[in-house]
């Protein structure tokens, strides 16, 4: 549904021209851009979010600033039509709601929106537009961003950590993407780039400032400057030639798609107002040439649309992991996926040498089963384990991973999008071999798209410890773990999560729970509560006494309910702003 939302946003944005035919042409040009289809093929959901959000955001920013619609008999400069106070309240509320939802899923898109609004302000100063209106639009975008941050508290605090910027723009890669100018111009971020005819849509974009007048010239200038800067940033960021990292190429190119739509709409309107009927010169053939390129530029998407597959791979890495590693009959477990950021599923945590890692429960690589990369678990517990492998400080890393329930380690190699058999993404030298040298990791037969190691020492996320493991669990520290045979634990309470608490008859002994110690996890046996105790130095266990019917529950702190109540009130407040009478 994100792609049609983007089309509707382009329709709203192209309303800057007071000509329905020109507006329709702009929407068609936006739909012809292969960016979202390449994102679908490559599984880049953040690019899809950018494609859907950015035209709506630019439309609301324009409306808040008071930049009006280009009309036939306008004067030089922007058409300014400042909204009333009530209208501005409604517009900033809409922006806050849009930015709040976007920030929850893709904060890097908000960064690109603010950059676009700033470039519009600079364009107004250069081309003779209304700097006051553009400045008001930028101020409205900043206010909406602040509101969006508040709406997403306290979860936004994860971006204040040491790797907060990586969480926003993505982790650095081992090798740069280095797409090159041609691929950037044709939005070639994935297999469904649809050839090179799309570059013909740049002709109307570049010609529009040359043949248009008055407010149409200002809008054409905005589109050209924003697209040129966006393309330059995407090109430099792709080649890793900037002193800082920016969002991925597809997100940086999303404003260019909006600019192509504006350029197409402006050239159609300008041809009928500023070109046709005037003294014959170079402007007429140039404008006519740009009109001819429009249908040619949309041909690829028209040809590819009936199939609807957009060259997607037949199966994804996540689907393969679910099929191969989804058996939970022996208890709940975790999968540690570590590799190139372009192959590791989202919510990754940055490691060294351009690698990232992510944790999933029970082989299901979905958002609900991900262990947040912003948690202390990912930052404090997993990284030292990877360090131990990289430094060869132990040959028993499987035993160190066992308390966390890590059963499989997956190194993705090929996704048939970013990494193919003909052009695989390289891994750091000796990376695979370091895992293969571990004595308690067994190389499992799997597809060529990934390397799978199974931890022979893994302990179920919830399980009754074996006698030997129970004796050593109170010792803590890596030395006790490495020296202990941890097999033989019995899985219990399968399916336990912070929101689901199944009950089961369990025997006497020591119940291991593979979560970092948290007193809010409570075990009840026959209705009596049991307090958790530290286990293996990182996780926790419960003494079950004589056993009985057990249930493991997570009790949310009072602050969680206060935050939910506060967020609900804020959302109601924003909703009232959206419903402000016109």
What are these regions (language model features)?
Residues 475-582:
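Active-site-proximal, structured, solvent-exposed surfaces of multi-pass membrane proteins
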Residues 404-479:
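Aromatic/acidic, Gly/Pro-rich catalytic loop(s) in extracytoplasmic/lumenal soluble domains
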Residues 3-16, 21-126, 140-156, 335:
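Membrane-embedded helix bundles of polyisoprenyl
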Residues 214-241:
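Transmembrane alpha-helix segments characteristic
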């Amino acid at each position: 549904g994100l792609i049609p939302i983007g089309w509707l946003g382009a329709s709203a944005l192209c309303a800057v021209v007071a000509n329905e035919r020109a507006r329709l042409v702009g929407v068609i040009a936006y739909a012809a851009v292969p960016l979202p289809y390449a994102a679908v093929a490559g599984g880049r959901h953040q690019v899809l979010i950018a494609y859907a959000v950015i035209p709506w955001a630019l439309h609301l920013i324009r409306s808040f600033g008071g930049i009006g619609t280009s009309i036939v008999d306008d004067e030089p400069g922007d058409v300014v039509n400042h909204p009333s106070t009530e209208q501005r309240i409604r517009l900033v509320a809409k922006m806050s709601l849009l930015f709040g939802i976007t920030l929850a899923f893709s904060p890097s898109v908000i960064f690109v929106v603010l950059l676009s609004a700033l470039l519009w302000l600079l364009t107004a100063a250069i081309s003779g537009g209304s700097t006051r209106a553009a400045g008001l639009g930028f101020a409205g975008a900043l206010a909406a961003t602040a509101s969006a941050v508040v709406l997403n508290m306290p979860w936004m605090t994860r971006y204040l950590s040491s790797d907060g910027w990586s969480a926003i723009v993505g982790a650095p890669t081992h090798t740069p993407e280095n797409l090159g100018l041609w691929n950037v111009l044709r939005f070639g971020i994935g297999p469904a780039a649809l050839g090179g005819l799309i570059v013909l849509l740049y002709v109307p974009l570049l010609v529009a400032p040359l043949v248009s007048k008055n407010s149409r010239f200002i809008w054409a200038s905005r589109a050209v400057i924003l697209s040129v800067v966006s393309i330059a940033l995407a090109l430099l960021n792709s080649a890793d030639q900037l002193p800082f990292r920016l969002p991925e190429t597809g997100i940086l190119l999303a404003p260019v798609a909006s600019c192509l739509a504006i350029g197409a709409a402006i050239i159609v309107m300008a041809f009928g107002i500023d070109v046709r009927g005037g003294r014959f010169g170079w402007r007429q053939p140039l404008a006519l040439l740009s009109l001819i390129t429009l249908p040619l530029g949309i041909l690829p998407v028209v040809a590819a649309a009936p199939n609807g597959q957009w060259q997607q791979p037949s199966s994804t890495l996540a689907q393969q992991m679910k099929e191969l590693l989804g058996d939970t009959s022996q208890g709940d477990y975790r999968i540690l996926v570590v590799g190139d950021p372009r192959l590791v599923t989202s919510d990754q945590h940055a490691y060294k040498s351009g690698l990232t890692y992510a944790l999933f429960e029970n082989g299901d690589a979905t958002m609900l089963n991900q262990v947040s990369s912003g948690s202390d678990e990912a930052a404090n517990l997993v990284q030292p384990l990877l360090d131990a492998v990289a430094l060869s400080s132990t040959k028993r890393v499987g035993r160190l991973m066992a308390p966390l329930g890590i059963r499989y380690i997956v190194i993705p190699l090929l996704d048939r999008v970013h990494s193919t058999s003909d052009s695989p993404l390289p891994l750091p030298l000796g990376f695979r071999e370091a895992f293969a040298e571990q004595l308690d990791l067994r190389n499992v037969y799997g597809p060529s798209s990934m390397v799978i190691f199974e931890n022979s020492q893994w302990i179920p996320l919830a399980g009754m410890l074996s006698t030997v493991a129970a004796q050593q669990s109170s010792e803590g520290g890596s030395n006790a773990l490495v020296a202990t045979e941890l097999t033989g634990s019995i899985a219990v309470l399968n399916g336990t999560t912070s929101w689901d608490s199944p009950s089961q008859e369990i025997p006497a002994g020591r119940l291991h729970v593979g979560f970092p110690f948290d007193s809010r996890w409570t075990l009840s046996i026959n209705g009596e509560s049991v307090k958790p105790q530290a286990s293996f130095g990182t996780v926790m266990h419960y003494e079950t006494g004589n056993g009985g019917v057990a249930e493991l529950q997570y009790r949310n702190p009072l602050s969680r309910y206060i935050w939910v109540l506060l967020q609900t009130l804020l959302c109601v407040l924003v909703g009232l702003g959206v419903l402000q009478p016109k």
